[in-house]
Amino acid sequence: MIPTQDVSWTDIESLIEKLSENILKLSRNFSSITTLSRGGLVPSRLLADSLGIKKIFVDQNTISSDSLFVDDIFDSGKTFDNIFSCVDNPSKFIFATLFARRDIQYPEQLIYGEKTLDNSYVVFPWDKLEFKNSIQ
């Protein structure tokens, strides 16, 4: 069986609060949030509400540097690498996640709520069914 780190909605609310505080410390005004469909959708909406950001863009070919990019987890770095080339000004790009995988190197653009406990698969409340179906 695959070891998991199960995350509750209460955990998510705490992480959103912590991540919002970390983002506000940057003293940046983000005009929007950009995300990828699936994993980033729920955290994007919650962060948008918390930060008062009205626009959320999904699956964009170009990412504005004044848009906060949001995903659920920084894991292998593959998502970051894929979208980084789409950013109009990489020096101003911020990549925000609820979790960052423990014991890996992070890009300087990453801001996160907390590190994972270990290398277990993180199961978010919105993907429990997907995970369950994937192991059957």
Q: Where are the model-predicted features located?
A:
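PRPP-associated nucleotide enzymes
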Residues: 1-136
